């Protein structure tokens, strides 16, 4: 993951740190971020053109339920199936006529008119790999957030891409992928405390604020002298990149966005005293401040979704741990975004890396199942109350309108204002896939 102040070996285009220093001149600020910003701006992706037309600015909160949530105990119950398939829980009506979900989601049942469900997501591996869910491809390590970062850039001083929740399991290297380290997210492992440790946004221990500003003054003098010798457009923009790097290090807006103690205790309690709930609150603060893409991984500390049944991981965990935290946190996020006028411009996505087996095993749990899983989308212009596709009677496979990972990816990109038909820069990441028509 990208950390301000650490050496970065490669950027989006694969050039080395030495080459970056040659392009950027003296590294008197003591940071490599300005070089990364500069290289990202001045070198377009090989063979890819400029955007076709202006886009509406949107953000995304992408919630990854690592471990593989069961479709039966969430958004696709099967009340008419045999007991060993439907499980011990019933279904409940929602505020969308004809749409029912599991009774373990009473708060979300009252908010489904703001959500769209995909009940026919298919073509996943059935294993613990995040690639299809986070990239739309089995082979890619380039996440949605990295692509959005590369195509849209930063808003003000805020980092464009933030990951909450620690490393993704069993998928080493996922992040910037082919776009390089400059498109990796800022990683915040645990936002549960009242204030996050923001080492990423701090000066090195041996660099005082006074020394930092002295370096900036020296750099400005060097840049002015160099500009007189070379008036090219790239040289003229150097001050901008160093200013952006310095702003990230010193901006109170950036630090405040990561400071949960700024929130009312009553609102923090509404989100829930869990890592998941507090991460959702931080995600809202980030998109409100200008972050384009927040990728939020479900925390193992809140209980794993991998409910095989052994080691006390059976279906009862859904009722006792997982669903109460999920239901409380997600429903509060949707309310909070709506109340702040952010829901229309913020896409919320919920998905795991797989579903669970139709039949409950002899341990009282469900095993891996890649042939069918659900996804929930809300906000960002998504038509609420929509249900895309359906599963068969046993929840084993799509019965209607199967949605593949690349089609899911195309839907996300289109909703975020990236024209999947006209913008040639997106094609390397989705191929010929089209968005789900009912959702865009």
Residues covered by each model-derived region:
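Ligand-binding pockets and gating/stacking loops
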Residues: 1-440
């Amino acid at each position: 993951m990208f950390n301000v102040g650490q050496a970065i070996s490669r950027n989006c285009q694969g050039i080395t740190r030495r080459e970056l220093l040659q392009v950027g001149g003296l590294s008197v600020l003591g940071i490599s971020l300005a070089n990364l910003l500069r290289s990202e701006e001045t070198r377009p992706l090989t063979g890819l053109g400029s955007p076709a037309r202006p886009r509406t600015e949107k953000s995304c909160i992408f919630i990854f339920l690592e471990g593989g949530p069961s479709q039966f105990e969430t958004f696709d119950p099967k009340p008419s199936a045999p007991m060993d398939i439907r499980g011990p829980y019933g279904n409940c009506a929602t505020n969308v006529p004809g749409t029912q979900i599991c009774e373990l989601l009473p708060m979300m049942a009252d908010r489904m008119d703001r959500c769209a469900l995909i009940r026919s997501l298919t073509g996943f591996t059935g294993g613990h790999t995040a690639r299809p869910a986070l990239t739309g491809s089995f082979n890619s390590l380039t996440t949605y957030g990295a692509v959005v970062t590369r195509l849209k850039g930063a808003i003000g001083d805020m980092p464009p891409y933030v990951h909450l929740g620690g490393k993704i399991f069993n998928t080493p290297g996922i992040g910037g992928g082919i776009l390089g380290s400059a498109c990796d997210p800022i990683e915040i492992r645990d936002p549960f405390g009242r204030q996050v440790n923001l080492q990423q946004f701090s000066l090195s221990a041996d660099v005082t604020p006074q020394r930092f500003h002295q370096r900036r003054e020296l750099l400005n003098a060097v840049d002015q002298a160099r500009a007189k010798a070379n008036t090219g457009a790239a040289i003229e923009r150097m001050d901008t990149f160093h200013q952006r790097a310095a702003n990230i290090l010193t901006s109170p807006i950036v630090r405040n966005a990561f400071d949960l103690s700024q929130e009312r205790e009553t609102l923090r309690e509404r989100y829930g005293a869990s890592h998941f709930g507090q991460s959702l609150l931080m995600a809202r603060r980030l998109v409100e401040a200008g972050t384009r893409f927040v990728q939020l991984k479900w925390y193992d500390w809140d209980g794993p979704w991998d409910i095989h049944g052994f080691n006390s991981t059976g279906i009862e965990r859904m009722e006792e741990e997982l669903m109460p935290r999920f239901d409380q946190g997600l429903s509060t996020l949707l309310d909070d975004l709506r109340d702040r006028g952010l829901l229309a411009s913020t896409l919320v996505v919920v998905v795991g890396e797989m579903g669970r087996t139709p039949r409950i095993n002899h341990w009282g749990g469900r095993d891996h199942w890649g042939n069918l899983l659900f996804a929930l989308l809300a906000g960002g212009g998504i038509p609420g109350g929509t249900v895309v596709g359906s599963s068969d009677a046993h929840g084993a496979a799509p019965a209607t309108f199967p949605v593949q990972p690349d089609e899911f990816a195309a839907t996300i990109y289109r909703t975020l204002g990236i024209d999947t038909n006209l913008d040639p820069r997106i094609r390397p990441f989705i191929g010929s896939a089209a968005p789900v028509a009912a959702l865009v």
